[in-house]
Each structure stands twice: as structure tokens, then as C-alpha cells.
């Protein structure tokens, strides 16, 4: 008998952008498991969104402005950051039209800077 066992390849990290929120798949959610809040930003010249997880200690330390920290919902199979103002800024800066159903982009973890980047150069 020559049995070939199925071994599913790991999925890449993805982020789905809508006008109201960013939803991360299970692979990307791994990086937010211990996040209490996140910081969100973007680099217009590199066409990336940056999401930095903050531990509870870092979020409550007092050296990060309250207006720079955002809540994240972390579930077993996805995570989500909801902020319409940020998403409108992303649409304006990157000239995107995000439908309610969303657009999906690949995400990458940056070990050196300890944040997740969302590559807006190519929609999945």
C-alpha cells in the first residue's frame, strides 16, 4: 500500500479591507494573539499599511497617545480592527475604492520592527 497523506500547505497571511475595518485571517491573527490594542499607520511611498500590536503593559504605560491606540478584536479564526476614519484615510491616500465586501491583500510580519505590513501593491 502506498498511501499519500494530505498535508495542507500553510496559508499566507491576508488582510481584507472594507470602508469600516481591516479583517485579518487566522495566519495573520497569530501575531495579534497577545495584543491588547494596536497602532495603525501607513507608508504611502511603499504602498503599505502597518499594524503594530501593543501588549497591555505597553498600551497602558502612558507614553503612547490615546488617539494613537485602537482596539482589536481577536477570535480563534480571525481578528479585526474597526476604524472608519483610518479606512477613509487609506482610501484617500492610496486612491482605493473599497466595497462593503472588501478587497483582500497579502500581509507580512516584520520581525525587526515587530509589526504586520499589508501590501497594497497587488490585490489578491
State what each model feature region is:
Residues 1-3, 45-124:
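Mature exported/compartmentalized surface modules and terminal targeting/interaction regions
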Residues 1-19:
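Glycine-rich loop/turn
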Residues 9, 34, 101-103:
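Residues that act as N-cap/strand-start positions at coil-to-secondary-structure junctions
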Residues 13-16, 40-42, 104-109:
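Short, exposed beta-strand/loop patches in secreted or surface proteins that constitute
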Residues 20-33, 83-88:
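Short beta-strand-centered segments at strand-helix junctions
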Residues 30-48, 53:
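Acidic (E/D-rich), amphipathic helical modules within compact regulatory domains
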